[in-house]
């Protein structure tokens, strides 16, 4: 908007400033010789108003009017006195005539003080006075009279104008818009046209992603343009005057605007950022300043409704989420995104089946192996070193069906004639700024990659223009290939949910009908498609400036790069080292948003023409047109909800009720099954199957049972979509998106069950029904009873599979870095075969015993183990003596020799200070023979003293565990 130039007379009707009277100075009368100002002239501080001389010298002027000095020069007898202004203002009245003698203190001129209607950084544009440095005689700063309180220029909040001049400029803007038959569109950036993240982008070479820094030392930001963004802006700019309004910083807003509009043809200076916001929590505070005459011609598109306080002229946009785990980076303070940064699930469209299984890249994009990306941004790595320049992709291929043709007629918000006449949205909106590895920006090599290349400022415009025609033939092939890769319907047929477009919280896009996209529909075209892949990607370097690649645009990009802290080849050369992968971002919401805005524009000027013809008395207002068009979407629908919110919560406060009412639907609370009842429902929106309402509604043929995605799809398209595309399935609650607008979950999430708990919490073991066999001399546990697998020692349920503690054929993973012995079907001879369990300090650190208690218990265990070691030594020496004196009793000798093995093992473990309970393993033959021997000689080796010792040892070990 134009700003009044300095020196302009204040607008008529402005408040009258204080009028000051300038009086004749000095004690003696003065004669006025001449005026240096005229009535209506603007004066500044120090300007000469008049020239005087003393009145006494005027009486004797006839005799001695002048005298000759010694040098021969003539000078006046009395010096002239100049009257200077002490304040700035406008001369309203001259109270004396030249030649008149003015008495001391008489009024000479009446001066109206400057109202400072235009102020720039504290300086008045009318009088030039510095309003920040006015000092009064007592040293306190004066408060000057200034009427400049309105900031009308987006990016210059320091430029203030008076409210009267603001209204005058506002009326001029409205007249200009009416002459051009345009409206005003306030455009949000984050998650509306772009998606930005600070997270490391592993696929740095993904097409359509810009990598930049806002300053030295700042984190690298990665911005993805929404598909069809450039095409959307270029078409809407013909109907609307675009204004950018974002909660991002000023540098961020201008950098993103440079990506979207490098030639400054779409937004110009109309960029409003967080630094210019009056209210950091709301965007409505600046509307009064930007549009002093009201926002009756202003339409708003934003993904957030709260920041606009649910304004009636707001069109809610489906959130655009490309980077997983990142929401709105510039969300207002106190919002959910700024506090929790919750991960947003983003459903992406599925690809056409390929011979090899699809691969999921870290960005969450399903990609077909072996297919190079060709979405109109840049060439594959093998072609980027060539000399071909960027080529536009704005010309649609003749005969190629429009993307909107794949949707059912009931979903299209416009007529078939409008769809046929509308140009096809191109993929040129998804663009990326990168530099070929073999090129340096400072060398001026031919064919620098992109129209908007952050690292290039020496693009050759001549070669760029020369190669446009040569690559235009391959544009249609690349577009046709992407058209064939549209998502296919699910096997359920008409019951498939929408997956073809990116899903916004709670408002999914409906998929194509089953009959229109069969899995093998384009099978014959697969080989030509892959064969012409290289040719289809040769045009990949799509420009951001309407397909115009010239030097001026490259210079603009270079300036934006320097402003944002990205130097030539600093961060983008290395991004091309990785192999390009296909981008399958199938978000097409901007296509439907464009149709909605066209409908609003058409309806406004249809009413405006009627207003000019005196057919209607009231001028059209966007704030009434948007709700009126929106309320016609579901005007003949009666909705009843089931399972979307708690029963004790008022339904009027839910988002489903708010948006359904805005779409014109009638909300019912009681299900009426009679088809002839006047208050019967036509649609039942349920969150889960199996409820009483759902079972009753499914028996009625006139009632549509759909899931909540049907409502959000109607909202994002402003059209009643097909109910068959959104059936209610049993697993809908499980597959429900986390970013759904539904504010209340239907059920508490069940914690996931781990297949193997890394640190199971095992309380003190309880005596089980199994039989334990102990050694008669050492008191060690030899084995448990052969009544089946050993039961877990814990009686409390542990959140893991039962098989995680049992012996299974695959090797068990190591716990705490120790080797686990091989389990042998329940044969675990003693502590040497027992798995190490986590200690109390590892599982329950707050209940750990103190150091003194542990030392005391260790001492007791060492004493017990020492006694057992002495007994085992004596038992070991006994068979050695028996070998010297042969005896006929062989079973006894065999038994004693067998018992020597665990004793020596225990002695070596105690002497070497190894881990307690970590013993040498026995072979299967020893275990089998020992089991059979102990079963036959069990009664012979039992003693009361050994039993007491074994019980004491087991109790101590259980306490330690």
From Swiss-Prot:
GO BP of this protein: cell division; exit from mitosis; negative regulation of cell growth involved in cardiac muscle cell development; positive regulation by host of viral transcription; protein dephosphorylation; transcription elongation by RNA polymerase II
Disulfide bonds: none
Annotated compartments: Nucleus; Cytoplasm, Cytoskeleton, Microtubule organizing center, Centrosome; Cytoplasm, Cytoskeleton, Spindle pole; Midbody
Acidic residues bias spans: 450-462, 575-588, 860-873, 937-947
InterPro entries: BRCT_dom, BRCT_dom_sf, Fcp1, FCP1_C, FCP1_dom, FCP1_euk, HAD-like_sf, HAD_sf
Residues recorded as bearing N6-acetyllysine in the entry: 780
Name of the protein in question: RNA polymerase II subunit A C-terminal domain phosphatase
Native species: Homo sapiens
Lineage: Eukaryota, Metazoa, Chordata, Craniata, Vertebrata
Encoding gene, per UniProt annotation: CTDP1
